[in-house]
Amino acid sequence: MNKIIFVLVISFFSILSLQAQSKELGVASEIRNILESSSLGELSHDSKVNFSQYDLLIKFYSKREFKEAWTKEGGLSSQALVLRDQVRESLYDGLVPEDYYLGQLDDIIMNFEIEKMGENALQLAYVDLIFSESYLKLATDLYKGKTPQEAIKTNWQIQAKTVKVKFEEVLESAVKGDSIGQSIRGFWPEYKVYANIRESLRDYYKMASSQEENTPELEYKKLIKLGDRNRLIVEIRSRLIGEGSEVDSELYDSALLKEVLKVQKRFGLNPDGVIGPATISALNETPEDMILRIAVNLERLRWLPDTVVEDKFIMVNIANYQLDYVQDNGLDTLFSSKVIVGKQYRSTPVFNGEMSYIVFSPTWTVPLSIVRGEMIPKIKRDPSYLSRNHMKILTYSGKEVDPAGLEWSTVSVKNFPYMVRQSPGPHNSLGLVKFIFPNKFNVYIHDTPSKSLFDKDIRAFSHGCIRLHKPAEFAEVILQDNALWDKEKIYEAMHSGKETAVMLKKKIPVVILYLTFWTDTGGKNYIRKDIYNRDEEIARALFQ
Protein backbone atom coordinates (compact mmCIF):
# COMPACT_ATOMS: atom_id res chain seq x y z
CA MET A 1 0.00 0.00 0.00
CA ASN A 2 1.33 3.39 -0.95
CA LYS A 3 2.32 5.38 2.16
CA ILE A 4 1.14 8.65 0.62
CA ILE A 5 -2.35 7.25 0.38
CA PHE A 6 -2.18 6.17 4.02
CA VAL A 7 -1.32 9.75 4.99
CA LEU A 8 -4.31 11.08 3.08
CA VAL A 9 -6.71 8.75 4.78
CA ILE A 10 -5.48 7.31 8.05
CA SER A 11 -2.04 6.88 9.62
CA PHE A 12 -1.78 3.26 10.53
CA PHE A 13 1.79 3.34 11.86
CA SER A 14 0.58 2.78 15.44
CA ILE A 15 -1.33 -0.38 14.53
CA LEU A 16 1.00 -2.27 12.20
CA SER A 17 0.91 -5.31 14.45
CA LEU A 18 -2.89 -5.50 14.11
CA GLN A 19 -2.72 -5.37 10.32
CA ALA A 20 -1.05 -8.73 10.13
CA GLN A 21 -4.02 -10.28 11.86
CA SER A 22 -6.59 -8.50 9.67
CA LYS A 23 -6.21 -10.91 6.78
CA GLU A 24 -7.47 -13.70 8.99
CA LEU A 25 -10.40 -11.71 10.42
CA GLY A 26 -13.47 -10.37 8.67
CA VAL A 27 -14.46 -6.71 8.65
CA ALA A 28 -17.20 -7.34 11.22
CA SER A 29 -14.69 -8.86 13.63
CA GLU A 30 -12.38 -5.90 13.15
CA ILE A 31 -15.19 -3.41 13.81
CA ARG A 32 -16.08 -5.27 16.99
CA ASN A 33 -12.47 -5.42 18.15
CA ILE A 34 -12.01 -1.70 17.57
CA LEU A 35 -15.17 -0.72 19.43
CA GLU A 36 -14.44 -3.04 22.34
CA SER A 37 -10.77 -2.11 22.69
CA SER A 38 -8.65 1.02 22.83
CA SER A 39 -8.15 1.02 19.07
CA LEU A 40 -10.88 3.64 18.55
CA GLY A 41 -8.83 6.09 20.57
CA GLU A 42 -5.83 5.37 18.37
CA LEU A 43 -7.97 5.92 15.29
CA SER A 44 -9.23 9.25 16.68
CA HIS A 45 -5.65 10.42 17.07
CA ASP A 46 -4.40 9.12 13.73
CA SER A 47 -7.37 10.11 11.55
CA LYS A 48 -8.23 13.34 13.41
CA VAL A 49 -11.79 12.09 13.77
CA ASN A 50 -13.27 12.72 17.20
CA PHE A 51 -15.57 9.77 17.79
CA SER A 52 -18.09 11.73 19.81
CA GLN A 53 -20.94 9.36 18.89
CA TYR A 54 -19.39 6.28 20.52
CA ASP A 55 -22.56 5.19 22.33
CA LEU A 56 -24.58 5.38 19.13
CA LEU A 57 -21.86 3.53 17.22
CA ILE A 58 -22.03 0.67 19.72
CA LYS A 59 -25.83 0.49 19.43
CA PHE A 60 -25.74 0.67 15.64
CA TYR A 61 -23.10 -1.99 15.05
CA SER A 62 -24.18 -4.39 17.80
CA LYS A 63 -27.69 -4.60 16.33
CA ARG A 64 -26.25 -5.47 12.92
CA GLU A 65 -23.75 -7.95 14.40
CA PHE A 66 -20.93 -5.49 13.64
CA LYS A 67 -21.28 -5.97 9.88
CA GLU A 68 -19.97 -3.16 7.72
CA ALA A 69 -22.48 -0.56 6.52
CA TRP A 70 -20.60 1.51 3.97
CA THR A 71 -18.47 -1.04 2.08
CA LYS A 72 -19.42 -4.06 0.06
CA GLU A 73 -17.12 -6.69 -1.35
CA GLY A 74 -14.14 -4.50 -0.64
CA GLY A 75 -15.53 -1.37 -2.27
CA LEU A 76 -17.47 1.68 -1.12
CA SER A 77 -21.24 1.60 -1.44
CA SER A 78 -23.07 4.23 -3.46
CA GLN A 79 -24.59 5.48 -0.19
CA ALA A 80 -21.12 6.42 1.05
CA LEU A 81 -20.90 8.87 -1.83
CA VAL A 82 -24.37 10.17 -0.99
CA LEU A 83 -23.31 10.79 2.61
CA ARG A 84 -20.24 12.70 1.46
CA ASP A 85 -22.50 14.90 -0.66
CA GLN A 86 -24.90 15.44 2.26
CA VAL A 87 -22.00 16.49 4.47
CA ARG A 88 -20.93 18.98 1.80
CA GLU A 89 -24.53 20.25 1.63
CA SER A 90 -24.55 20.87 5.41
CA LEU A 91 -22.95 24.20 4.53
CA TYR A 92 -26.47 25.35 3.63
CA ASP A 93 -27.74 24.29 7.05
CA GLY A 94 -25.45 26.94 8.48
CA LEU A 95 -23.02 24.25 9.63
CA VAL A 96 -19.34 23.58 8.93
CA PRO A 97 -18.86 20.48 6.71
CA GLU A 98 -15.39 19.92 8.13
CA ASP A 99 -17.03 19.25 11.52
CA TYR A 100 -18.43 16.10 9.90
CA TYR A 101 -15.07 15.11 8.40
CA LEU A 102 -15.65 16.14 4.80
CA GLY A 103 -11.91 16.13 4.12
CA GLN A 104 -11.48 12.60 5.44
CA LEU A 105 -14.49 11.34 3.47
CA ASP A 106 -13.15 12.94 0.28
CA ASP A 107 -9.73 11.34 0.81
CA ILE A 108 -11.21 7.91 1.46
CA ILE A 109 -13.37 8.09 -1.66
CA MET A 110 -10.45 9.26 -3.77
CA ASN A 111 -8.21 6.47 -2.50
CA PHE A 112 -10.80 3.82 -3.26
CA GLU A 113 -10.83 5.12 -6.82
CA ILE A 114 -7.03 5.13 -7.08
CA GLU A 115 -6.19 1.84 -5.45
CA LYS A 116 -8.01 -1.24 -4.22
CA MET A 117 -8.40 -0.85 -0.47
CA GLY A 118 -10.63 -3.87 0.03
CA GLU A 119 -7.81 -6.31 0.71
CA ASN A 120 -7.37 -5.17 4.31
CA ALA A 121 -10.26 -5.88 6.68
CA LEU A 122 -8.89 -3.62 9.39
CA GLN A 123 -8.66 -0.71 7.02
CA LEU A 124 -12.22 -1.30 5.81
CA ALA A 125 -13.39 -1.39 9.43
CA TYR A 126 -11.85 2.01 10.10
CA VAL A 127 -13.40 3.43 6.95
CA ASP A 128 -16.81 2.13 8.00
CA LEU A 129 -16.55 3.67 11.46
CA ILE A 130 -15.55 7.06 10.08
CA PHE A 131 -18.55 7.17 7.75
CA SER A 132 -20.91 6.11 10.54
CA GLU A 133 -19.46 8.73 12.90
CA SER A 134 -19.93 11.39 10.22
CA TYR A 135 -23.57 10.40 9.67
CA LEU A 136 -24.49 10.23 13.35
CA LYS A 137 -22.79 13.51 14.23
CA LEU A 138 -24.49 15.36 11.37
CA ALA A 139 -27.84 13.76 12.21
CA THR A 140 -27.74 14.77 15.88
CA ASP A 141 -26.66 18.34 15.07
CA LEU A 142 -29.44 18.74 12.50
CA TYR A 143 -32.00 17.33 14.91
CA LYS A 144 -31.03 19.05 18.17
CA GLY A 145 -28.77 21.89 17.09
CA LYS A 146 -24.99 21.99 17.05
CA THR A 147 -24.74 24.22 20.11
CA PRO A 148 -26.53 23.17 23.31
CA GLN A 149 -29.05 25.94 23.96
CA GLU A 150 -28.26 25.87 27.69
CA ALA A 151 -24.69 26.89 26.85
CA ILE A 152 -25.92 30.15 25.29
CA LYS A 153 -26.07 33.01 27.76
CA THR A 154 -28.74 34.94 25.90
CA ASN A 155 -32.22 34.59 27.35
CA TRP A 156 -33.43 31.48 25.48
CA GLN A 157 -35.82 29.60 27.75
CA ILE A 158 -37.87 27.56 25.30
CA GLN A 159 -38.33 24.00 26.45
CA ALA A 160 -35.55 21.84 25.01
CA LYS A 161 -36.47 19.34 22.33
CA THR A 162 -37.26 15.87 23.64
CA VAL A 163 -35.16 13.38 21.69
CA LYS A 164 -37.63 10.82 20.39
CA VAL A 165 -35.49 9.66 17.49
CA LYS A 166 -33.30 6.56 17.72
CA PHE A 167 -30.49 7.68 15.46
CA GLU A 168 -28.92 4.23 15.16
CA GLU A 169 -32.22 2.76 13.95
CA VAL A 170 -32.70 5.51 11.38
CA LEU A 171 -29.18 4.87 10.09
CA GLU A 172 -29.84 1.12 9.88
CA SER A 173 -33.03 1.71 7.92
CA ALA A 174 -31.29 4.19 5.60
CA VAL A 175 -28.43 1.77 4.91
CA LYS A 176 -30.84 -1.05 4.10
CA GLY A 177 -33.09 1.15 1.98
CA ASP A 178 -30.36 3.07 0.15
CA SER A 179 -31.95 6.26 1.48
CA ILE A 180 -29.11 8.09 3.23
CA GLY A 181 -29.92 11.45 1.65
CA GLN A 182 -33.61 11.23 2.47
CA SER A 183 -32.88 10.20 6.04
CA ILE A 184 -30.51 13.15 6.59
CA ARG A 185 -33.16 15.57 5.34
CA GLY A 186 -35.59 13.89 7.72
CA PHE A 187 -33.64 15.34 10.64
CA TRP A 188 -34.46 18.90 9.59
CA PRO A 189 -36.89 20.73 11.89
CA GLU A 190 -40.56 20.16 11.06
CA TYR A 191 -41.11 23.86 10.36
CA LYS A 192 -41.42 24.39 6.63
CA VAL A 193 -39.71 27.75 6.93
CA TYR A 194 -36.44 25.88 7.62
CA ALA A 195 -36.17 24.59 4.05
CA ASN A 196 -37.04 28.06 2.74
CA ILE A 197 -34.30 29.71 4.79
CA ARG A 198 -31.86 27.00 3.77
CA GLU A 199 -32.33 27.85 0.09
CA SER A 200 -31.76 31.51 0.86
CA LEU A 201 -28.45 30.60 2.48
CA ARG A 202 -27.44 28.78 -0.68
CA ASP A 203 -28.22 31.93 -2.67
CA TYR A 204 -26.13 34.11 -0.36
CA TYR A 205 -23.15 31.76 -0.67
CA LYS A 206 -23.43 32.16 -4.45
CA MET A 207 -23.55 35.95 -4.02
CA ALA A 208 -20.50 35.87 -1.76
CA SER A 209 -18.49 33.87 -4.30
CA SER A 210 -19.35 36.24 -7.16
CA GLN A 211 -19.12 39.53 -5.24
CA GLU A 212 -16.40 41.98 -6.14
CA GLU A 213 -13.79 42.40 -3.45
CA ASN A 214 -13.52 45.60 -1.43
CA THR A 215 -17.05 46.82 -2.07
CA PRO A 216 -17.07 50.33 -0.56
CA GLU A 217 -19.23 50.90 2.50
CA LEU A 218 -21.85 53.58 2.05
CA GLU A 219 -21.46 56.52 4.43
CA TYR A 220 -24.55 58.31 5.67
CA LYS A 221 -24.34 62.11 5.65
CA LYS A 222 -27.89 63.39 5.20
CA LEU A 223 -31.39 62.26 4.26
CA ILE A 224 -31.93 61.64 0.54
CA LYS A 225 -35.47 62.00 -0.79
CA LEU A 226 -37.05 61.34 -4.16
CA GLY A 227 -35.86 64.00 -6.62
CA ASP A 228 -32.68 64.82 -4.68
CA ARG A 229 -29.28 64.77 -6.31
CA ASN A 230 -26.47 63.10 -4.37
CA ARG A 231 -23.20 61.39 -5.28
CA LEU A 232 -24.15 58.47 -3.04
CA ILE A 233 -26.99 57.67 -5.43
CA VAL A 234 -24.44 56.48 -8.02
CA GLU A 235 -23.28 53.61 -5.78
CA ILE A 236 -26.78 52.83 -4.49
CA ARG A 237 -28.09 52.62 -8.07
CA SER A 238 -25.22 50.33 -9.02
CA ARG A 239 -26.04 47.95 -6.17
CA LEU A 240 -29.79 47.86 -6.61
CA ILE A 241 -30.28 48.25 -10.37
CA GLY A 242 -26.88 47.72 -11.94
CA GLU A 243 -24.63 49.78 -14.10
CA GLY A 244 -25.16 50.91 -17.65
CA SER A 245 -28.60 52.47 -17.39
CA GLU A 246 -28.84 55.68 -19.39
CA VAL A 247 -30.10 57.96 -16.63
CA ASP A 248 -28.81 60.84 -14.55
CA SER A 249 -26.87 58.61 -12.15
CA GLU A 250 -26.87 61.13 -9.26
CA LEU A 251 -30.64 61.73 -9.40
CA TYR A 252 -32.87 59.79 -7.01
CA ASP A 253 -35.59 58.87 -9.50
CA SER A 254 -38.74 56.72 -9.41
CA ALA A 255 -36.97 53.63 -10.79
CA LEU A 256 -34.52 53.65 -7.89
CA LEU A 257 -37.32 54.45 -5.46
CA LYS A 258 -38.99 51.11 -6.26
CA GLU A 259 -35.81 49.25 -5.34
CA VAL A 260 -35.26 51.27 -2.16
CA LEU A 261 -38.81 50.49 -1.04
CA LYS A 262 -38.11 46.77 -1.52
CA VAL A 263 -35.04 47.03 0.71
CA GLN A 264 -36.94 48.94 3.39
CA LYS A 265 -39.74 46.36 3.43
CA ARG A 266 -37.26 43.49 3.51
CA PHE A 267 -35.52 44.97 6.55
CA GLY A 268 -38.73 45.91 8.37
CA LEU A 269 -38.15 49.65 7.98
CA ASN A 270 -40.80 52.28 7.35
CA PRO A 271 -41.26 52.08 3.55
CA ASP A 272 -41.24 55.84 2.98
CA GLY A 273 -38.55 55.81 0.30
CA VAL A 274 -36.37 58.22 2.28
CA ILE A 275 -32.76 57.05 2.37
CA GLY A 276 -31.68 57.61 5.96
CA PRO A 277 -29.19 55.96 8.35
CA ALA A 278 -31.26 52.77 8.77
CA THR A 279 -31.60 52.30 5.01
CA ILE A 280 -27.88 52.95 4.50
CA SER A 281 -27.12 50.36 7.19
CA ALA A 282 -29.33 47.84 5.39
CA LEU A 283 -27.59 48.54 2.07
CA ASN A 284 -24.21 47.96 3.74
CA GLU A 285 -25.14 44.38 4.70
CA THR A 286 -22.79 42.07 2.79
CA PRO A 287 -23.46 38.47 1.69
CA GLU A 288 -21.00 37.39 4.40
CA ASP A 289 -23.04 39.27 7.01
CA MET A 290 -26.18 37.56 5.78
CA ILE A 291 -24.57 34.11 5.82
CA LEU A 292 -23.80 34.47 9.53
CA ARG A 293 -27.26 35.86 10.27
CA ILE A 294 -29.00 33.02 8.43
CA ALA A 295 -26.85 30.34 10.07
CA VAL A 296 -27.78 31.68 13.51
CA ASN A 297 -31.49 31.57 12.74
CA LEU A 298 -31.33 28.05 11.31
CA GLU A 299 -29.75 26.97 14.60
CA ARG A 300 -32.58 28.65 16.53
CA LEU A 301 -35.12 26.66 14.52
CA ARG A 302 -33.24 23.44 15.30
CA TRP A 303 -33.59 24.21 19.01
CA LEU A 304 -37.37 24.44 18.87
CA PRO A 305 -39.30 21.46 20.26
CA ASP A 306 -41.60 19.60 17.90
CA THR A 307 -44.48 20.29 20.30
CA VAL A 308 -44.53 23.89 19.06
CA VAL A 309 -45.97 22.62 15.79
CA GLU A 310 -49.64 22.36 16.71
CA ASP A 311 -52.87 22.69 14.77
CA LYS A 312 -53.08 26.29 15.98
CA PHE A 313 -50.52 28.29 17.91
CA ILE A 314 -49.60 31.86 18.78
CA MET A 315 -46.17 33.03 17.69
CA VAL A 316 -44.51 36.28 18.68
CA ASN A 317 -41.27 37.18 16.91
CA ILE A 318 -39.60 39.70 19.22
CA ALA A 319 -37.24 40.99 16.54
CA ASN A 320 -40.14 41.49 14.12
CA TYR A 321 -42.40 43.21 16.69
CA GLN A 322 -45.28 41.06 15.50
CA LEU A 323 -47.75 38.48 16.82
CA ASP A 324 -49.23 35.86 14.51
CA TYR A 325 -51.95 33.34 15.33
CA VAL A 326 -51.37 30.53 12.84
CA GLN A 327 -52.31 27.01 11.85
CA ASP A 328 -51.10 24.39 9.35
CA ASN A 329 -47.46 24.53 10.43
CA GLY A 330 -47.51 28.31 10.38
CA LEU A 331 -48.57 28.56 6.74
CA ASP A 332 -52.11 29.82 7.39
CA THR A 333 -52.31 33.05 9.40
CA LEU A 334 -55.56 33.57 11.29
CA PHE A 335 -54.59 36.88 12.90
CA SER A 336 -51.64 39.30 12.90
CA SER A 337 -50.84 42.38 14.94
CA LYS A 338 -47.97 44.69 15.71
CA VAL A 339 -46.52 44.32 19.19
CA ILE A 340 -44.26 46.27 21.53
CA VAL A 341 -41.58 44.25 23.33
CA GLY A 342 -39.12 44.79 26.16
CA LYS A 343 -36.40 47.40 26.23
CA GLN A 344 -32.86 46.13 25.77
CA TYR A 345 -32.16 46.21 29.51
CA ARG A 346 -35.55 44.59 30.24
CA SER A 347 -35.61 42.27 27.27
CA THR A 348 -38.53 39.98 26.54
CA PRO A 349 -37.39 36.40 27.16
CA VAL A 350 -37.64 33.64 24.57
CA PHE A 351 -39.85 30.87 25.93
CA ASN A 352 -42.99 28.86 25.28
CA GLY A 353 -46.18 28.24 27.22
CA GLU A 354 -49.92 27.73 26.88
CA MET A 355 -52.53 30.47 26.90
CA SER A 356 -55.26 29.39 29.32
CA TYR A 357 -57.39 32.47 30.05
CA ILE A 358 -58.17 36.10 29.22
CA VAL A 359 -58.81 38.93 31.70
CA PHE A 360 -61.03 41.83 30.66
CA SER A 361 -60.74 45.20 32.46
CA PRO A 362 -57.67 44.01 34.36
CA THR A 363 -56.10 45.60 37.39
CA TRP A 364 -52.32 45.95 37.37
CA THR A 365 -50.28 44.94 40.36
CA VAL A 366 -47.05 46.78 39.64
CA PRO A 367 -43.98 44.51 39.77
CA LEU A 368 -41.80 45.27 42.77
CA SER A 369 -38.82 45.98 40.54
CA ILE A 370 -40.75 48.81 38.85
CA VAL A 371 -42.08 50.13 42.18
CA ARG A 372 -38.61 50.29 43.64
CA GLY A 373 -36.71 51.33 40.54
CA GLU A 374 -39.12 53.86 39.06
CA MET A 375 -42.18 54.72 41.15
CA ILE A 376 -40.85 55.54 44.61
CA PRO A 377 -38.67 58.42 43.31
CA LYS A 378 -41.66 59.75 41.30
CA ILE A 379 -44.00 59.55 44.31
CA LYS A 380 -41.50 61.41 46.46
CA ARG A 381 -41.26 64.20 43.89
CA ASP A 382 -44.99 64.36 43.20
CA PRO A 383 -47.46 63.43 46.02
CA SER A 384 -50.30 63.35 43.47
CA TYR A 385 -48.57 60.73 41.28
CA LEU A 386 -50.57 57.82 42.70
CA SER A 387 -54.02 59.44 42.46
CA ARG A 388 -53.36 60.83 38.97
CA ASN A 389 -52.49 57.34 37.77
CA HIS A 390 -55.43 55.65 39.55
CA MET A 391 -53.11 53.71 41.83
CA LYS A 392 -53.50 52.48 45.40
CA ILE A 393 -51.06 51.23 48.01
CA LEU A 394 -51.97 47.88 49.59
CA THR A 395 -50.49 45.62 52.22
CA TYR A 396 -49.71 42.09 51.08
CA SER A 397 -52.89 40.99 52.86
CA GLY A 398 -54.89 43.32 50.59
CA LYS A 399 -55.60 46.16 53.04
CA GLU A 400 -55.51 49.64 51.49
CA VAL A 401 -52.96 52.09 52.93
CA ASP A 402 -53.40 55.87 52.85
CA PRO A 403 -50.27 57.22 51.12
CA ALA A 404 -50.64 60.50 53.04
CA GLY A 405 -50.07 58.56 56.24
CA LEU A 406 -46.66 57.24 55.15
CA GLU A 407 -43.44 59.02 56.08
CA TRP A 408 -42.11 59.23 52.53
CA SER A 409 -38.87 60.89 53.59
CA THR A 410 -37.87 57.62 55.28
CA VAL A 411 -39.14 55.31 52.54
CA SER A 412 -36.47 53.77 50.33
CA VAL A 413 -36.36 51.11 47.66
CA LYS A 414 -35.27 48.61 50.31
CA ASN A 415 -37.95 49.27 52.94
CA PHE A 416 -41.22 49.51 51.05
CA PRO A 417 -43.32 46.54 52.31
CA TYR A 418 -46.36 47.28 50.16
CA MET A 419 -47.97 46.58 46.79
CA VAL A 420 -49.02 49.21 44.28
CA ARG A 421 -52.14 48.38 42.27
CA GLN A 422 -53.70 50.29 39.38
CA SER A 423 -57.49 50.17 38.93
CA PRO A 424 -59.15 48.96 35.70
CA GLY A 425 -59.93 51.37 32.88
CA PRO A 426 -58.46 53.05 29.80
CA HIS A 427 -55.75 54.60 31.99
CA ASN A 428 -54.47 51.17 33.08
CA SER A 429 -50.99 50.27 31.84
CA LEU A 430 -52.33 46.88 30.74
CA GLY A 431 -55.11 48.54 28.77
CA LEU A 432 -58.52 46.88 28.65
CA VAL A 433 -57.54 43.21 28.33
CA LYS A 434 -54.67 40.84 29.02
CA PHE A 435 -53.99 37.33 27.71
CA ILE A 436 -52.43 34.94 30.21
CA PHE A 437 -50.11 32.00 29.54
CA PRO A 438 -48.66 31.27 33.02
CA ASN A 439 -44.86 31.40 33.15
CA LYS A 440 -42.04 32.05 35.59
CA PHE A 441 -41.20 35.37 33.91
CA ASN A 442 -44.61 36.91 34.66
CA VAL A 443 -44.78 37.91 30.99
CA TYR A 444 -48.12 38.17 29.23
CA ILE A 445 -49.75 39.79 26.21
CA HIS A 446 -51.86 42.87 26.90
CA ASP A 447 -53.48 46.02 25.58
CA THR A 448 -51.89 49.43 26.18
CA PRO A 449 -53.09 53.05 26.35
CA SER A 450 -49.88 54.15 24.57
CA LYS A 451 -51.12 53.53 21.02
CA SER A 452 -48.80 56.04 19.33
CA LEU A 453 -45.77 53.83 19.97
CA PHE A 454 -47.04 51.33 17.41
CA ASP A 455 -46.15 53.83 14.68
CA LYS A 456 -42.44 53.42 15.45
CA ASP A 457 -40.12 51.16 13.42
CA ILE A 458 -38.28 50.05 16.56
CA ARG A 459 -40.84 49.06 19.19
CA ALA A 460 -38.80 47.98 22.22
CA PHE A 461 -40.41 50.06 24.98
CA SER A 462 -41.93 47.69 27.55
CA HIS A 463 -40.59 46.16 30.77
CA GLY A 464 -40.67 42.72 29.16
CA CYS A 465 -44.36 42.07 28.56
CA ILE A 466 -45.86 42.12 25.07
CA ARG A 467 -48.20 45.00 24.22
CA LEU A 468 -50.70 44.28 21.47
CA HIS A 469 -51.91 46.76 18.85
CA LYS A 470 -55.26 45.05 18.13
CA PRO A 471 -56.33 43.43 21.43
CA ALA A 472 -60.11 43.46 20.86
CA GLU A 473 -59.78 41.72 17.49
CA PHE A 474 -57.40 39.18 19.03
CA ALA A 475 -59.89 38.42 21.81
CA GLU A 476 -62.60 37.83 19.21
CA VAL A 477 -60.43 35.34 17.33
CA ILE A 478 -59.34 33.52 20.49
CA LEU A 479 -62.93 33.23 21.76
CA GLN A 480 -64.60 32.43 18.44
CA ASP A 481 -65.38 28.88 19.62
CA ASN A 482 -67.22 30.27 22.68
CA ALA A 483 -70.78 31.27 21.76
CA LEU A 484 -71.15 33.20 25.02
CA TRP A 485 -68.48 35.70 23.99
CA ASP A 486 -69.36 37.57 20.82
CA LYS A 487 -67.99 40.93 19.68
CA GLU A 488 -70.53 42.96 21.66
CA LYS A 489 -69.97 41.11 24.92
CA ILE A 490 -66.19 41.37 24.56
CA TYR A 491 -66.50 45.14 24.05
CA GLU A 492 -68.77 45.42 27.07
CA ALA A 493 -66.37 43.44 29.28
CA MET A 494 -63.39 45.50 28.15
CA HIS A 495 -65.14 48.72 29.18
CA SER A 496 -66.98 47.55 32.30
CA GLY A 497 -64.34 48.66 34.79
CA LYS A 498 -64.79 45.31 36.52
CA GLU A 499 -62.12 42.64 36.25
CA THR A 500 -63.51 39.55 34.49
CA ALA A 501 -61.59 36.34 33.72
CA VAL A 502 -62.62 33.97 30.91
CA MET A 503 -61.11 30.48 30.73
CA LEU A 504 -60.37 29.15 27.26
CA LYS A 505 -62.07 25.91 26.26
CA LYS A 506 -58.76 24.66 24.89
CA LYS A 507 -55.31 25.93 25.80
CA ILE A 508 -53.40 27.50 22.92
CA PRO A 509 -49.64 26.96 22.57
CA VAL A 510 -47.64 30.19 22.67
CA VAL A 511 -44.06 30.51 21.50
CA ILE A 512 -42.06 33.71 21.97
CA LEU A 513 -39.32 33.61 19.35
CA TYR A 514 -36.34 35.71 18.36
CA LEU A 515 -35.68 35.43 14.62
CA THR A 516 -33.70 38.05 12.74
CA PHE A 517 -34.05 36.32 9.35
CA TRP A 518 -36.67 34.15 7.67
CA THR A 519 -37.91 33.31 4.18
CA ASP A 520 -41.56 32.94 3.19
CA THR A 521 -43.05 30.30 0.90
CA GLY A 522 -42.65 32.65 -2.05
CA GLY A 523 -38.90 32.93 -1.49
CA LYS A 524 -38.98 36.47 -0.08
CA ASN A 525 -36.40 37.19 2.60
CA TYR A 526 -37.10 39.21 5.73
CA ILE A 527 -34.27 40.70 7.79
CA ARG A 528 -34.68 42.30 11.19
CA LYS A 529 -32.38 44.29 13.43
CA ASP A 530 -30.76 42.26 16.21
CA ILE A 531 -32.23 44.55 18.88
CA TYR A 532 -30.89 42.54 21.83
CA ASN A 533 -27.49 41.75 20.26
CA ARG A 534 -28.09 38.01 20.54
CA ASP A 535 -26.87 36.80 17.14
CA GLU A 536 -23.15 37.21 17.73
CA GLU A 537 -22.87 34.73 20.60
CA ILE A 538 -24.60 31.99 18.62
CA ALA A 539 -22.50 32.73 15.53
CA ARG A 540 -19.32 32.35 17.58
CA ALA A 541 -20.51 29.02 18.94
CA LEU A 542 -21.37 27.75 15.46
CA PHE A 543 -18.14 28.72 13.75
CA GLN A 544 -15.50 28.60 16.49
Enumerate the predicted regions with their spans.
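Positively charged n-region of N-terminal signal peptides that target proteins for export
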Residues: 1-5, 20
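Bacterial N-terminal signal peptides
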Residues: 7-15
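Well-ordered beta-sheet/strand-loop patches within structured domains
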Residues: 21-64, 129, 136-137, 156, ...
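Cationic-aromatic interfacial patches
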Residues: 22-163
